[in-house]
Amino acid sequence: MKKIITLLFAAIAIMSCNKTSQKKQTAEILRDKPWQEISPSEIELNPLQMIDRDWLEVSAGKEGKMNLMTISWGSIGELWNKPIFTVYVSTSRYTHQFMEENDYFTVTHFPASMKDKLAYLGRVSGRDEDKVAGAGLTVEFTELGNPIYAEADLAIECRKIYAQQFDACLLPPEQRAWYEQTGNGIHYMYIGEILHVWKK
């Protein structure tokens, strides 16, 4: 009986190590894999899956002064005959000031093995610590100087073409109550024209 229990624990330990190894391997493979530029219409991921379930990182700023945060609100589509990506950032978030100060932002998608890293990036503020280092990400910069990440499998670079804060007076009662109860700053909507899309 003791031998069976010992073997069982050993099997569990091996499975755990294998899962950790697979996660590491996925990140390492993507880190070394070159980006391939595609058109916005060639994005294959389901938007609802990509935004609401997988989560994304929105980043703004330049080398030496940038920030990123995890988002699960957003949309992709067409406006004024331009392909667009829309993100929503609360005024209480550190990323908000970077979105205001910069003309561009990027949206990046990561493999499922990185979900715990995205949870960390959504939980911790860049005011308090170096989130990029904490998540073990490798920052790369586009020709326009905007941050994307070597461990991501999709990167979307946008030029900000419209920004406006939600009008509290026009919010549905339940949403207005949510802002009042949580103390979260009312979100800004940022619409970005998609300039470049890269995948791995």
Regions found by a protein language model. Name each.
Residues 2-8:
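Sec-dependent signal peptide recognition
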Residues 1-2, 186:
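Structural motif marking the loop-to-transmembrane transition
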